[in-house]
């Protein structure tokens, strides 16, 4: 059974991705900052699920994860990089510490994970002409358009998009594909926490002309499962001729 690494596995999109991959007969090496895995993973045995506490912004922590995943026995099929943090504040009010913290996780973490996972995969198999190995970065539609309150966040995600496509170009000769997924507003704990107890989904759907933000033409915010399905597709052989692409899954919010 093929193994896929999932970072940010305890988060909304990360957890949904773990479940979607296991449903599609992948084994998952899950990682998150927390000491213990999400309670919804309790039924999964060691044959299909492993967990490790990892700080994606720490080079040695990421390297140790790559080593551990490589030692499971089966080759690493790919990875979904779903670890991320959000920050909502105008740029004029954003501290340099906040800026660095966002980039440490959302940009540096993506670079470290892509580099270390790719190194481990190449060490296992130098090249795979079938192009079945895949790395997927979960970014954000804020990487594509300016957001009044998400300037620093969008910049960190834009960095993740660009470094992912650059890795995709360099790893193509090894038969490893690299793509990014850009969700829009998704009902995850990270998003609902940022709403401070209010349900702002209707506002997201309607848009905000005063902040030059379009609404969502499909009429709803995303569920984590919506994004997980895209992640699983990009991991699967069905996408073996897709690389260096940025797949936007935001209900049309950035058309």
Feature-to-residue mapping (PLM):
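C-terminal substrate-recognition "lid" of short-chain dehydrogenase/reductases
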Residues: 218-249, 254
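Residue(s) in the substrate-gating loop at a strand-loop-helix junction
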Residues: 140
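Active-site helix of classical SDR
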Residues: 114, 156, 164
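Alpha-helical segment proximal to the catalytic Tyr-Lys
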Residues: 119, 169-170, 240
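Substrate-binding pocket helix/loop in short-chain dehydrogenase/reductase
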Residues: 90-91, 98-100, 212
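Short, small/polar-rich loop/turn modules that mediate ligand/substrate recognition or access, typified
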Residues: 172, 177, 242-244
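Conserved glycine-rich cofactor-binding loop
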Residues: 10-11
């Amino acid at each position: 059974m093929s193994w896929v690494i999932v970072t940010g596995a305890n988060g909304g999109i990360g957890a949904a991705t773990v479940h979607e991959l296991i449903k599609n007969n992948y084994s998952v090496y899950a990682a998150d900052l927390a000491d213990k895995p999400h309670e919804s993973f309790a039924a999964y045995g060691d044959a299909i699920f492993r967990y490790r506490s990892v700080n994606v912004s720490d080079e040695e922590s990421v390297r140790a994860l790559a080593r551990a995943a490589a030692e499971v026995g089966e080759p690493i099929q790919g990875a979904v990089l779903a670890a991320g943090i959000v920050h909502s504040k105008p740029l004029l009010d954003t501290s340099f510490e906040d800026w660095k913290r966002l980039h440490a996780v959302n940009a540096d973490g993506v670079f470290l994970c892509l580099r270390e996972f790719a190194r481990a995969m190449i060490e296992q198999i130098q090249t795979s002409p079938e192009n079945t190995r895949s790395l997927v970065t979960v970014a954000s539609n804020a990487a594509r358009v300016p957001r009044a309150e998400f300037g620093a966040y969008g910049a960190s995600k834009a960095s993740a998009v660009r470094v992912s496509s650059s890795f995709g170009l360099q790893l193509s000769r090894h038969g490893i594909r690299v793509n990014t997924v850009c969700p829009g507003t998704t009902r995850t704990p990270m998003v609902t926490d940022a709403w401070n107890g209010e349900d702002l989904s209707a506002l997201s759907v309607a848009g905000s002309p005063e902040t030059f933000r379009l609404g969502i033409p499909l009429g709803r915010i995303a569920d984590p499962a919506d994004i997980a399905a895209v992640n699983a597709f990009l991991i699967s052989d069905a996408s073996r001729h897709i690389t260096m692409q940025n797949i936007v899954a935001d209900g049309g919010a950035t058309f």
